[in-house]
Every structure is written in C-alpha cells, then in structure tokens.
Swiss-Prot record:
Uses described in the biotechnology field: This enzyme is capable of clotting milk and thus can be used for cheese production.
Keyword Transcription regulation: no
Protein name per Swiss-Prot or TrEMBL: Rhizopuspepsin
EC number: 3.4.23.21
Organism: Rhizopus azygosporus
Recorded effect of pH on activity: Optimum pH is 7 with hemoglobin as substrate.
Molecular function, one GO term: aspartic-type endopeptidase activity
Dependence of activity on temperature: Optimum temperature is between 45-50 degrees Celsius with hemoglobin as substrate. Loses 50% of its activity at 60 degrees Celsius.
Keyword Protease: yes
Class of this enzyme: hydrolase
Keywords: Aspartyl protease, Hydrolase, Protease
Family recorded in the similarity comment: Belongs to the peptidase A1 family.
GO biological process annotation, one example: proteolysis
Amino acid sequence: AGVGTVP
C-alpha cells in the first residue's frame, strides 16, 4: 500500500 511501498 502507498507510493513506492509493498503492498
């Protein structure tokens, strides 16, 4: 989840 993150 989020920007530039997993997930």
